[in-house]
Amino acid sequence: MIVVKEDFFKSDICNLIARGTEVYQWQYDHKADAANPRHNKFFISLLWTETTPKNFFYMLWRIIRKDIPLVGDCYCWRIIANGQVKGQNGDWHTDHGDKTVLYYPREWLPEWGGSTYFKTDDAETEVEYKQNRLVAFTSNISHYGSCPTVYNILRVSIAFSLRINKSGERNVAD
């Protein structure tokens, strides 16, 4: 299942998230499948994990969980930002965990490309990159993020990695 929500956060929060992407601490060493030498590297910034104090990004997760029924039964174990420039197409992959939420924080023109593609059964679905769009899906759906088609633009997506809350495992209201 894939759920797409437009204009998800209020404009002030959307703008704050977008401005924040300018100061992320990027590393250039991530792959969709680290064991696959043919997969392209791209940029990653670790925004929050279960072992770090709750922060702004965790607060965003709490808003998402409250407003997106598909992920209401989940807890978040990691939040990262993915960064891609021209030439850094993602590779088809599935995610770790049970469900994933992607958020597109930056202003974006359609001609810049950067769509996310999903493969379900034998069909491909394109979800265009659009600022303040949120995409939630089950992590076993194969997908990839395409790179920008123009130079000097960083495509940023924020990925919330989720697991289904098993009885007694996590407090869903946390």
Which stretches of residues belong to each language-model region?
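Non-heme Fe(II)/2-oxoglutarate
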Residues: 1-74, 80
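Catalytic core of non-heme Fe(II) oxygenases with the double-stranded beta-helix
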Residues: 54-174
